From Swiss-Prot:
CDD domains, sorted: Glycosylasparaginase
Coiled-coil boundaries: none
Lineage: Eukaryota, Metazoa, Ecdysozoa, Arthropoda, Hexapoda
Keyword check for Disulfide bond: yes
Protein name: Putative N(4)-(beta-N-acetylglucosaminyl)-L-asparaginase GL17147
InterPro entries in the record: Ntn_hydrolases_N, Peptidase_T2
The organism of origin for this protein: Drosophila persimilis (Fruit fly)
Amino acid sequence: MYKAQYLWLFGLVLISRSATERTTPKINFTTVVGLKTTPAMRSSSASSLGGSLPMVINTWNFTDANFLAWRILNVTQGGLRQTRNAVVEGCTRCEQQQCDRTVGYGGSPDELGETTLDAMIMDGSSMDVGAVAGLRGIKDAIRVARHVLEHTKHSILVGDLASQFAQAMGFRSESLATPESKAMWMEWTAANCQPNFWRNVHPDPSISCGPYKPKATPLTRWKEDRARTEYSIGHLNHDTIGMIAIDAANNIHAGTSSNGARHKIPGRVGDSPIPGAGAYADNEVGAAVATGDGDIMMRFLPTLLAVEAMRAGKKPAEAAEVGIRRISKHYKDFSGAVIAVDRLGQYGAACYGMTEFPFVVSNPSKTDIPSRQESVKCITGKEAVNVV
């Protein structure tokens, strides 16, 4: 059932290949990945760009995922009725390629050495959501999320029972471990499980592995404990793919896929599958996607904040800053980014805790280059004091 459902899509992409190549320059991916077609934007004063539809935009320099999504979007004129296919298959490409080992199988093993997956797809027309969290033994996370959206009245399925649902829908169960993920886990355990996500437990999590038990510690000390064992979030950790596709009729889908935080406590769910945290879409306004320290970001629903800021009149770049500044007010060591796009295709981004944040854009533009990489300079600690 699962294979049959996607054979038609594969056929459409092949059929459109020759037509697409007649209108699209051949791409040297080595060149495109290193390309900055737009001067780096400083997020504290960035102007929003674009305004052309249809479009696909995604986090990080995941160019292949964007390029496939763009081709699928162009199966029909103006991308009509293809935004869901574009986002799902674009993110699937990243899952298959194990982008930065932070998306898909074989990356970010938890404390027990297991890789689990989170993913979401949101329809900006109906406001329907399909998501999976802690998905075990199924590689096609965002395709399973699509089945949650299309075949259930629920929004999120989690854990083993999400895997059972996937199998009932025709997905194959298989190990998500690879020699690389096993080696990553063994290296971590050999280093006394450092760093990790525990606090206020014994034995001391900063120097030893568990099992841990809670200890009676004054609540005022938790920040000190957190600092000793906290991860450096950024490249190669928490690099969720978030993708937005908009067609010429302003129909929007937004989606995410991630294998979560490396060496997370088993059972942990990040921001990626949470509507308003990992992604949010509303045809009346636009959409936003986020990436970074999900445990912190999900507490602020930054993609919902960005969409609502655009609804209130802010430009996309300004809207992306809203959540970033609010988070950084409370968490000075936080690291993350938000991309915001309005319904007309204007886009902007903001980031914090990094030097620069790359993203990939495809739209009808003066350069006529699909899947071009752009970047934004990140807000510094001093700039972040002006909270929106």
